[in-house]
Curated annotation (Swiss-Prot):
Substrate binds at residues 264, 321-323. It comes from Shewanella sp. (strain W3-18-1). Keywords: ATP-binding, Ligase, Magnesium, Metal-binding, Nucleotide-binding, Tricarboxylic acid cycle. This is Succinate--CoA ligase [ADP-forming] subunit beta. Binds 1 Mg(2+) ion per subunit.
Length: 388
Protein backbone atom coordinates (compact mmCIF):
# COMPACT_ATOMS: atom_id res chain seq x y z
CA UNK A 1 0.00 0.00 0.00
CA UNK A 2 1.33 3.43 -0.96
CA UNK A 3 0.82 6.78 0.73
CA UNK A 4 0.40 10.21 -0.79
CA UNK A 5 3.12 12.80 -0.32
CA UNK A 6 1.04 14.81 2.16
CA UNK A 7 0.42 11.67 4.23
CA UNK A 8 4.11 10.78 4.23
CA UNK A 9 5.02 14.28 5.37
CA UNK A 10 2.48 14.16 8.19
CA UNK A 11 4.28 11.06 9.49
CA UNK A 12 7.64 12.78 9.04
CA UNK A 13 6.40 15.69 11.16
CA UNK A 14 5.27 13.32 13.93
CA UNK A 15 8.85 12.07 14.19
CA UNK A 16 10.30 15.57 14.29
CA UNK A 17 11.62 15.69 10.73
CA UNK A 18 11.87 19.06 8.95
CA UNK A 19 9.04 19.43 6.41
CA UNK A 20 7.38 22.39 4.73
CA UNK A 21 4.19 23.82 6.18
CA UNK A 22 1.42 22.63 3.94
CA UNK A 23 -2.22 21.65 3.59
CA UNK A 24 -3.94 19.01 1.47
CA UNK A 25 -6.98 20.60 -0.17
CA UNK A 26 -10.13 19.16 -1.75
CA UNK A 27 -11.32 22.33 -3.51
CA UNK A 28 -9.84 25.33 -5.29
CA UNK A 29 -11.15 27.67 -2.58
CA UNK A 30 -9.45 25.57 0.12
CA UNK A 31 -6.19 25.79 -1.82
CA UNK A 32 -6.37 29.59 -1.95
CA UNK A 33 -7.19 29.75 1.76
CA UNK A 34 -4.30 27.38 2.53
CA UNK A 35 -1.87 29.75 0.83
CA UNK A 36 -3.19 32.55 3.03
CA UNK A 37 -2.75 30.45 6.18
CA UNK A 38 0.81 29.56 5.21
CA UNK A 39 1.70 33.18 4.49
CA UNK A 40 4.61 34.48 2.46
CA UNK A 41 4.55 35.38 -1.20
CA UNK A 42 5.57 32.15 -2.94
CA UNK A 43 3.96 28.71 -2.78
CA UNK A 44 4.26 25.26 -4.32
CA UNK A 45 1.09 23.43 -5.41
CA UNK A 46 1.24 19.71 -6.18
CA UNK A 47 -1.23 17.14 -7.49
CA UNK A 48 -1.47 14.20 -5.10
CA UNK A 49 -1.23 10.88 -6.96
CA UNK A 50 0.69 7.65 -6.38
CA UNK A 51 3.17 8.28 -9.18
CA UNK A 52 6.41 10.08 -9.86
CA UNK A 53 7.10 12.45 -12.73
CA UNK A 54 4.40 14.91 -11.66
CA UNK A 55 6.49 17.97 -12.40
CA UNK A 56 7.19 17.06 -16.02
CA UNK A 57 3.49 16.26 -16.51
CA UNK A 58 2.39 19.67 -15.26
CA UNK A 59 1.26 18.41 -11.86
CA UNK A 60 3.53 20.74 -9.85
CA UNK A 61 3.57 24.52 -9.97
CA UNK A 62 5.50 27.25 -8.14
CA UNK A 63 3.60 30.52 -7.99
CA UNK A 64 3.24 33.76 -6.07
CA UNK A 65 -0.29 34.40 -7.32
CA UNK A 66 -3.24 32.98 -5.37
CA UNK A 67 -5.44 33.15 -8.46
CA UNK A 68 -2.95 30.88 -10.23
CA UNK A 69 -3.33 28.47 -7.32
CA UNK A 70 -7.10 28.59 -7.81
CA UNK A 71 -6.75 28.00 -11.56
CA UNK A 72 -4.31 25.11 -10.99
CA UNK A 73 -6.66 23.42 -8.52
CA UNK A 74 -9.72 23.94 -10.72
CA UNK A 75 -7.84 22.47 -13.67
CA UNK A 76 -6.60 19.31 -11.93
CA UNK A 77 -9.13 18.36 -9.25
CA UNK A 78 -11.35 15.61 -10.61
CA UNK A 79 -9.07 14.92 -13.56
CA UNK A 80 -6.44 12.24 -14.19
CA UNK A 81 -2.73 13.02 -14.20
CA UNK A 82 -0.71 11.01 -16.71
CA UNK A 83 3.01 10.60 -16.02
CA UNK A 84 5.70 8.19 -17.20
CA UNK A 85 4.89 6.02 -14.16
CA UNK A 86 1.15 5.68 -14.88
CA UNK A 87 -0.75 3.97 -17.68
CA UNK A 88 -2.35 5.94 -20.48
CA UNK A 89 -5.39 6.68 -18.30
CA UNK A 90 -3.34 8.22 -15.51
CA UNK A 91 -4.40 8.49 -11.88
CA UNK A 92 -7.22 10.63 -10.46
CA UNK A 93 -6.38 13.85 -8.61
CA UNK A 94 -8.61 14.26 -5.54
CA UNK A 95 -6.32 16.47 -3.47
CA UNK A 96 -3.93 19.35 -4.07
CA UNK A 97 -1.04 19.94 -1.66
CA UNK A 98 -0.24 23.62 -1.06
CA UNK A 99 3.12 24.24 0.62
CA UNK A 100 5.48 27.04 1.48
CA UNK A 101 8.31 27.44 -1.02
CA UNK A 102 11.81 26.31 -0.06
CA UNK A 103 15.00 27.93 -1.38
CA UNK A 104 17.30 25.11 -2.51
CA UNK A 105 21.09 25.18 -2.54
CA UNK A 106 21.69 21.45 -3.12
CA UNK A 107 19.72 18.22 -3.53
CA UNK A 108 20.49 14.87 -1.89
CA UNK A 109 18.78 11.48 -1.86
CA UNK A 110 17.86 9.40 1.19
CA UNK A 111 15.85 6.20 1.05
CA UNK A 112 15.37 2.81 2.67
CA UNK A 113 14.08 -0.59 1.61
CA UNK A 114 13.84 -4.10 3.02
CA UNK A 115 16.76 -5.93 1.41
CA UNK A 116 15.71 -9.55 0.98
CA UNK A 117 19.27 -10.77 0.46
CA UNK A 118 20.51 -9.49 3.84
CA UNK A 119 17.06 -9.62 5.48
CA UNK A 120 17.71 -6.17 6.87
CA UNK A 121 16.45 -2.64 6.41
CA UNK A 122 19.02 -0.91 4.22
CA UNK A 123 19.38 2.87 4.00
CA UNK A 124 20.74 4.45 0.86
CA UNK A 125 22.07 7.99 0.52
CA UNK A 126 23.46 9.83 -2.47
CA UNK A 127 24.59 13.27 -3.56
CA UNK A 128 22.52 12.72 -6.72
CA UNK A 129 19.21 13.99 -5.35
CA UNK A 130 16.27 14.83 -7.57
CA UNK A 131 17.23 12.02 -9.97
CA UNK A 132 15.67 8.54 -10.20
CA UNK A 133 17.77 6.38 -7.90
CA UNK A 134 17.44 3.46 -10.36
CA UNK A 135 19.22 5.58 -12.96
CA UNK A 136 21.99 6.46 -10.49
CA UNK A 137 22.37 2.78 -9.54
CA UNK A 138 22.75 1.84 -13.19
CA UNK A 139 25.07 4.62 -14.35
CA UNK A 140 27.06 5.65 -11.24
CA UNK A 141 26.53 3.03 -8.51
CA UNK A 142 29.59 4.29 -6.62
CA UNK A 143 27.60 7.41 -5.71
CA UNK A 144 25.11 5.39 -3.64
CA UNK A 145 26.20 4.85 -0.04
CA UNK A 146 24.50 2.27 2.18
CA UNK A 147 23.92 1.57 5.86
CA UNK A 148 22.51 -1.79 6.97
CA UNK A 149 20.35 -1.69 10.10
CA UNK A 150 20.88 -4.57 12.53
CA UNK A 151 17.45 -5.57 13.89
CA UNK A 152 18.97 -6.40 17.29
CA UNK A 153 20.69 -3.06 17.91
CA UNK A 154 18.52 -0.85 15.71
CA UNK A 155 19.78 2.29 13.94
CA UNK A 156 22.95 3.81 15.35
CA UNK A 157 24.07 7.47 15.21
CA UNK A 158 27.49 6.43 13.89
CA UNK A 159 25.79 5.01 10.79
CA UNK A 160 24.19 8.38 10.13
CA UNK A 161 27.52 10.15 10.62
CA UNK A 162 29.22 7.74 8.23
CA UNK A 163 26.64 8.50 5.53
CA UNK A 164 26.81 12.21 6.33
CA UNK A 165 30.58 12.30 5.82
CA UNK A 166 30.18 10.61 2.44
CA UNK A 167 27.57 13.21 1.48
CA UNK A 168 29.99 16.01 2.38
CA UNK A 169 27.87 17.52 5.15
CA UNK A 170 29.26 20.09 7.58
CA UNK A 171 29.04 19.56 11.39
CA UNK A 172 25.71 21.40 11.75
CA UNK A 173 24.17 19.49 8.87
CA UNK A 174 25.60 16.27 10.29
CA UNK A 175 23.56 16.73 13.48
CA UNK A 176 20.44 17.41 11.43
CA UNK A 177 21.09 14.40 9.21
CA UNK A 178 21.58 12.14 12.23
CA UNK A 179 18.21 13.21 13.62
CA UNK A 180 16.53 12.60 10.26
CA UNK A 181 18.22 9.21 9.83
CA UNK A 182 17.31 8.00 13.32
CA UNK A 183 13.73 9.24 12.95
CA UNK A 184 13.24 7.57 9.58
CA UNK A 185 14.74 4.28 10.74
CA UNK A 186 12.48 4.20 13.79
CA UNK A 187 9.46 5.15 11.68
CA UNK A 188 10.30 2.44 9.12
CA UNK A 189 10.05 -0.31 11.73
CA UNK A 190 7.20 1.23 13.75
CA UNK A 191 4.89 1.36 10.74
CA UNK A 192 6.07 -1.70 8.79
CA UNK A 193 7.33 0.21 5.77
CA UNK A 194 8.49 -1.66 2.69
CA UNK A 195 9.88 1.45 0.98
CA UNK A 196 10.82 4.95 2.03
CA UNK A 197 12.23 7.77 -0.10
CA UNK A 198 13.02 11.43 0.40
CA UNK A 199 13.98 12.61 -3.05
CA UNK A 200 15.15 15.22 -2.80
CA UNK A 201 16.42 15.78 0.72
CA UNK A 202 17.57 19.35 0.17
CA UNK A 203 20.12 21.68 1.69
CA UNK A 204 18.46 25.09 1.85
CA UNK A 205 20.20 28.36 1.05
CA UNK A 206 20.45 28.82 4.84
CA UNK A 207 22.42 25.57 5.06
CA UNK A 208 19.74 23.43 6.72
CA UNK A 209 18.44 20.00 5.70
CA UNK A 210 14.80 19.80 4.63
CA UNK A 211 12.54 16.93 3.50
CA UNK A 212 11.16 18.34 0.26
CA UNK A 213 9.35 15.21 -0.91
CA UNK A 214 8.18 11.96 0.62
CA UNK A 215 7.35 8.53 -0.75
CA UNK A 216 6.24 5.64 1.45
CA UNK A 217 5.19 2.08 0.66
CA UNK A 218 3.69 -0.10 3.40
CA UNK A 219 4.01 -3.88 3.65
CA UNK A 220 0.47 -5.00 2.80
CA UNK A 221 0.86 -8.13 4.93
CA UNK A 222 1.33 -5.96 8.03
CA UNK A 223 -1.73 -3.75 7.61
CA UNK A 224 -3.71 -5.82 10.11
CA UNK A 225 -1.54 -4.33 12.88
CA UNK A 226 -1.30 -0.83 11.40
CA UNK A 227 -4.86 0.57 11.67
CA UNK A 228 -3.68 4.18 11.56
CA UNK A 229 -1.74 3.69 8.35
CA UNK A 230 -4.42 1.44 6.86
CA UNK A 231 -6.93 4.27 7.29
CA UNK A 232 -4.77 6.39 4.97
CA UNK A 233 -5.42 4.07 2.03
CA UNK A 234 -6.76 5.86 -1.05
CA UNK A 235 -8.63 3.25 -3.13
CA UNK A 236 -9.01 5.68 -6.05
CA UNK A 237 -5.31 5.18 -6.79
CA UNK A 238 -5.63 1.39 -7.09
CA UNK A 239 -6.14 -0.46 -10.34
CA UNK A 240 -9.84 -1.43 -10.35
CA UNK A 241 -9.10 -5.03 -11.34
CA UNK A 242 -6.42 -5.40 -8.67
CA UNK A 243 -8.78 -4.04 -6.02
CA UNK A 244 -11.55 -6.42 -7.13
CA UNK A 245 -9.11 -9.35 -7.09
CA UNK A 246 -8.04 -8.54 -3.54
CA UNK A 247 -11.66 -8.93 -2.39
CA UNK A 248 -11.45 -12.61 -3.41
CA UNK A 249 -7.89 -13.07 -2.06
CA UNK A 250 -6.50 -13.23 -5.59
CA UNK A 251 -3.09 -11.72 -6.23
CA UNK A 252 -3.48 -9.84 -9.52
CA UNK A 253 -1.20 -7.38 -11.27
CA UNK A 254 -2.21 -5.93 -14.63
CA UNK A 255 0.39 -5.95 -17.43
CA UNK A 256 0.28 -4.84 -21.07
CA UNK A 257 0.31 -8.13 -23.01
CA UNK A 258 -2.43 -10.23 -24.62
CA UNK A 259 -2.02 -13.63 -22.88
CA UNK A 260 -4.06 -13.93 -19.70
CA UNK A 261 -2.41 -16.10 -17.04
CA UNK A 262 -4.09 -17.93 -14.16
CA UNK A 263 -1.75 -19.90 -11.91
CA UNK A 264 -1.67 -21.27 -8.36
CA UNK A 265 1.47 -20.13 -6.58
CA UNK A 266 3.49 -16.94 -7.02
CA UNK A 267 6.68 -18.72 -8.08
CA UNK A 268 4.87 -20.83 -10.67
CA UNK A 269 3.07 -17.70 -11.87
CA UNK A 270 6.36 -15.91 -12.49
CA UNK A 271 7.78 -18.97 -14.21
CA UNK A 272 4.68 -19.17 -16.40
CA UNK A 273 5.07 -15.53 -17.42
CA UNK A 274 8.73 -16.17 -18.25
CA UNK A 275 8.00 -19.14 -20.52
CA UNK A 276 5.20 -17.23 -22.29
CA UNK A 277 7.75 -14.50 -22.99
CA UNK A 278 10.30 -17.09 -24.08
CA UNK A 279 7.92 -18.34 -26.77
CA UNK A 280 7.20 -14.88 -28.12
CA UNK A 281 4.08 -14.02 -26.16
CA UNK A 282 3.35 -11.18 -23.77
CA UNK A 283 1.54 -11.83 -20.47
CA UNK A 284 -1.48 -9.61 -19.84
CA UNK A 285 -1.29 -10.13 -16.10
CA UNK A 286 0.16 -11.86 -13.08
CA UNK A 287 -2.59 -13.78 -11.28
CA UNK A 288 -2.04 -16.17 -8.39
CA UNK A 289 -5.25 -17.92 -7.29
CA UNK A 290 -3.44 -19.42 -4.29
CA UNK A 291 -3.85 -22.84 -2.77
CA UNK A 292 -7.63 -22.74 -2.39
CA UNK A 293 -8.55 -22.56 -6.07
CA UNK A 294 -12.30 -23.12 -5.71
CA UNK A 295 -14.83 -22.85 -8.53
CA UNK A 296 -15.92 -19.45 -7.24
CA UNK A 297 -12.38 -18.07 -7.14
CA UNK A 298 -11.54 -19.51 -10.56
CA UNK A 299 -14.71 -17.90 -11.95
CA UNK A 300 -13.77 -14.53 -10.47
CA UNK A 301 -10.25 -14.94 -11.82
CA UNK A 302 -11.64 -15.49 -15.32
CA UNK A 303 -13.88 -12.44 -14.97
CA UNK A 304 -10.96 -10.27 -13.92
CA UNK A 305 -8.67 -11.54 -16.68
CA UNK A 306 -11.33 -11.11 -19.37
CA UNK A 307 -12.20 -7.60 -18.20
CA UNK A 308 -8.97 -6.66 -19.99
CA UNK A 309 -9.95 -6.18 -23.64
CA UNK A 310 -6.36 -6.88 -24.72
CA UNK A 311 -6.59 -10.54 -23.66
CA UNK A 312 -6.77 -12.81 -26.73
CA UNK A 313 -6.12 -16.16 -25.00
CA UNK A 314 -5.90 -17.51 -21.45
CA UNK A 315 -3.35 -19.93 -20.02
CA UNK A 316 -4.37 -21.82 -16.87
CA UNK A 317 -1.35 -23.49 -15.26
CA UNK A 318 -2.15 -25.50 -12.13
CA UNK A 319 0.10 -27.74 -10.05
CA UNK A 320 -2.03 -29.97 -7.86
CA UNK A 321 -0.48 -30.45 -4.46
CA UNK A 322 -3.01 -30.07 -1.70
CA UNK A 323 -5.63 -29.21 -4.32
CA UNK A 324 -6.62 -32.10 -6.63
CA UNK A 325 -6.42 -31.45 -10.38
CA UNK A 326 -9.80 -33.07 -11.08
CA UNK A 327 -11.43 -30.58 -8.70
CA UNK A 328 -9.60 -27.74 -10.43
CA UNK A 329 -10.76 -29.04 -13.81
CA UNK A 330 -14.37 -29.03 -12.63
CA UNK A 331 -13.88 -25.50 -11.35
CA UNK A 332 -12.47 -24.39 -14.70
CA UNK A 333 -15.38 -25.97 -16.59
CA UNK A 334 -17.91 -24.34 -14.27
CA UNK A 335 -16.18 -20.99 -14.56
CA UNK A 336 -15.97 -21.14 -18.36
CA UNK A 337 -19.71 -21.92 -18.54
CA UNK A 338 -20.63 -19.23 -16.03
CA UNK A 339 -18.47 -16.47 -17.47
CA UNK A 340 -19.04 -17.36 -21.11
CA UNK A 341 -15.39 -17.30 -22.12
CA UNK A 342 -15.05 -16.49 -25.83
CA UNK A 343 -11.27 -16.61 -26.17
CA UNK A 344 -9.13 -19.77 -26.42
CA UNK A 345 -8.32 -21.36 -23.06
CA UNK A 346 -5.21 -23.53 -22.69
CA UNK A 347 -4.98 -25.63 -19.53
CA UNK A 348 -1.93 -27.40 -18.16
CA UNK A 349 -2.48 -29.65 -15.14
CA UNK A 350 0.23 -31.47 -13.18
CA UNK A 351 0.34 -33.16 -9.81
CA UNK A 352 -2.39 -34.92 -7.83
CA UNK A 353 -5.00 -36.51 -10.14
CA UNK A 354 -3.61 -34.63 -13.16
CA UNK A 355 -4.60 -37.38 -15.62
CA UNK A 356 -8.11 -37.50 -14.19
CA UNK A 357 -8.30 -33.73 -14.48
CA UNK A 358 -7.38 -33.87 -18.15
CA UNK A 359 -10.08 -36.50 -18.72
CA UNK A 360 -12.66 -34.25 -17.06
CA UNK A 361 -11.67 -31.40 -19.40
CA UNK A 362 -11.79 -33.69 -22.46
CA UNK A 363 -15.31 -34.91 -21.62
CA UNK A 364 -16.66 -31.42 -20.96
CA UNK A 365 -17.37 -30.69 -24.63
CA UNK A 366 -16.02 -27.17 -24.17
CA UNK A 367 -13.38 -25.58 -26.37
CA UNK A 368 -10.60 -26.04 -23.81
CA UNK A 369 -7.14 -26.98 -25.04
CA UNK A 370 -5.42 -29.48 -22.72
CA UNK A 371 -1.63 -29.12 -22.84
CA UNK A 372 0.74 -31.99 -22.09
CA UNK A 373 3.53 -29.86 -20.62
CA UNK A 374 4.34 -26.27 -19.68
CA UNK A 375 6.30 -25.80 -22.91
CA UNK A 376 3.42 -27.21 -24.91
CA UNK A 377 1.00 -24.92 -23.05
CA UNK A 378 3.11 -21.83 -23.74
CA UNK A 379 3.45 -22.66 -27.43
CA UNK A 380 -0.28 -23.31 -27.79
CA UNK A 381 -1.44 -20.19 -25.95
CA UNK A 382 0.93 -17.89 -27.87
CA UNK A 383 -0.34 -19.30 -31.18
CA UNK A 384 -3.94 -18.98 -29.99
CA UNK A 385 -3.39 -15.35 -28.99
CA UNK A 386 -2.02 -14.69 -32.47
CA UNK A 387 -5.11 -16.30 -34.01
CA UNK A 388 -3.24 -19.30 -35.37
Amino acid sequence: MNLHEYQAKSLFAEYGLPVSEGFACDTAQEAVEAAGRIGGNLWVVKCQVHAGGRGKAGGVKVTGDKEEIRAFAEHWLGKNLVTYQTDEKGQPVAKILVESCTDIANELYLGAVVDRSTRRVVFMASTEGGVEIEKVAEETPELIHKAIIDPLTGPQPYQARDLGFKLGLNPTQMKQFTKIFMGLATMFVDHDFALLEINPLVITTEGNLHCLDGKIGIDGNALFRQPKVKAMHDPSQDDAREAHAAMFELNYVALDGNVGCMVNGAGLAMGTMDIVNLHGGKPANFLDVGGGATKERVAEAFKIILSDSNVKAVLVNIFGGIVRCDMIAEGIIGAVKEVGVKVPVVVRLEGTNAELGREVLAKSGLDIIAATSLTDAAERVVKAAEGK
